[in-house]
Curated annotation (Swiss-Prot):
This is Glutamyl-tRNA reductase. Catalyzes the NADPH-dependent reduction of glutamyl-tRNA(Glu) to glutamate 1-semialdehyde (GSA). GO terms for molecular function: glutamyl-tRNA reductase activity; NADP binding. It comes from Vibrio vulnificus (strain YJ016). The gene is hemA. Pathway: Porphyrin-containing compound metabolism; protoporphyrin-IX biosynthesis; 5-aminolevulinate from L-glutamyl-tRNA(Glu): step 1/2.
């Protein structure tokens, strides 16, 4: 039993190579079935995302090159192209790597939580194909609990490191409850969609989407039960908004100082947060001069993000310590399992010797042998048989000039305790 992790990721391989080595839904089941039938593999889990492809295996001794060859052949990629970008981890290093990946410590965005869901899905897919053996089952279950511990004991995922999430976090800091806030989203592109998802996840249910094309706005609005308006209608709805988040490709500002000033009067000067994440700006810079209007630009958000990245790096130190501790503990547990097999075999061997000699002694007694003589002969033979293997091990260690091995054997036999 030996744990192996091989793979490529955004650190080691180009996008082109990552695409070639990816296991899409159409390939995954076949790949897992092939690995299950591989003579060198006891169990396997394949993790394949846009940033990494990794194969985790419980393998027989010396199977490293065989699994690499299989990966090369499966994707029909030459080893000369694959190997320079490939990393290989074995035993505790493989355990540690899986735990680091699952905790977001090896991600493009440090501490991102999505990778844990992807690891869980990879494990689930492998279980469906009956590719997960007992060792991998224990490893992945332990990994999930370690990831939970890291999230509980550190704040590695608690600081915004994307513009969309930073905008939402800023809104949460300024307004006590997003559940009571009305948000005007200007634009309907990918960034605004991410903002809407973050807002919705944080309890915001009152959203207005303003966009140049109504069709795109409707697609977004349907996901969150939001109202749709045109860009021209913004002046008529701006006063309703506690929060305005804007990201369009407009070459000119969409929201001007006068428009906001009018809206603030209608709001009786209740504060309004405006987050402009467009380049060039969607909101005139002069809006920031107005009382009760709090304007933040993409540069302000980047400053928050940079600070949060540094905070995540600090939290990552504690997370790495947890992973180091847990991976070492799991490796110790695995080694103890290997010892269990050896102990079982040793006990069985001793029992076989005992039964053999006892049978001979009983036959001697039945034949009228002297009981004392039979018992002495039994004890002598039993002693000689049981000490033969350790005696030979002591002799070999001495003959081969290996004092360290000799010391270990002496300690194992408890000889030093007899002095």
């Amino acid at each position: 039993m030996s744990l192996l992790a091989i793979g490529i990721n955004h650190h080691t391989a180009s996008v082109d190579l990552r695409e070639k080595v990816a296991f899409g839904p159409d390939k995954l089941a076949n790949a897992l079935q092939q690995l299950s039938q591989h003579e060198a593999v006891n169990g396997s889990v394949i993790l394949s995302t846009c940033n990494r492809t990794e194969v985790y295996c419980d393998v027989k001794s010396g199977a490293r090159s065989k699994v690499i060859d299989w990966l090369s052949q499966f994707h029909q990629i030459g080893l000369e192209e694959l190997k320079p970008s490939l990393y290989v981890y074995e035993e505790q290093a493989a355990i540690r790597h899986l735990m680091r990946v699952s905790c977001g410590l090896d991600s493009l965005v440090l501490g991102e939580p999505q990778i844990l869901g992807q690891v869980k899905q990879a494990y689930s897919d492998s279980r469906e194909q009956q590719a997960v053996d007992a060792s991998l089952e224990k490893l992945f279950q332990k990994t999930f609990s370690v990831a939970k511990r890291v999230r509980t004991e550190t704040d590695i995922g608690g600081n915004a490191v994307s513009v969309a999430y930073a905008a939402c976090t800023l809104a949460k800091h300024i307004f006590e409850s997003l559940e009571k806030s009305t948000v005007l989203l200007v634009g309907a592109g990918e960034t605004i969609e991410l903002v809407a998802k973050h807002l919705h996840a944080n309890g915001c249910s009152k959203m207005i989407v303003a966009n140049r094309t109504r069709e795109r706005a409707l697609t977004l609005a349907e996901q969150f039960d939001a109202q749709v308006i045109s860009l021209q209608d913004i002046p008529n709805h701006l006063a309703k908004a506690d929060i305005v988040i804007s990201s369009t490709a407009s070459p000119l500002p969409i929201i001007g100082k006068g428009m906001v000033e009018t809206a603030l009067k209608q709001r009786r000067h209740q504060p309004m947060l405006l987050v402009d994440i467009a380049v060039p700006r969607d909101v005139e810079a002069q809006v920031g001069e107005l009382n009760d209007a709090y304007l933040y630009t993409v540069d302000d958000l980047q400053s928050i993000i940079d600070n949060n990245i540094e905070q995540r790096k600090v939290e990552a130190i504690q997370a790495e310590a947890i992973v180091a501790e847990e991976s070492a503990a799991f490796m110790s547990w695995l080694r103890s399992l290997q010892a269990v097999d050896s102990i079982r075999e040793y006990r069985q061997s001793a029992n076989d010797i005992r039964e053999e000699l006892l049978s001979k002694a009983l036959l001697s007694l039945e034949s009228g042998g002297d009981p004392e003589k039979v018992l002495r002969e039994l004890s002598n033979r039993l002693t000689n048989k049981l000490i033969h293997a350790p005696t030979r091990a002591l002799q070999l260690a001495a003959e081969q000039g290996e004092p360290a091995k000799l010391t270990v054997i002496r300690q194992s036999l408890g000889l030093d305790e007899l002095k």
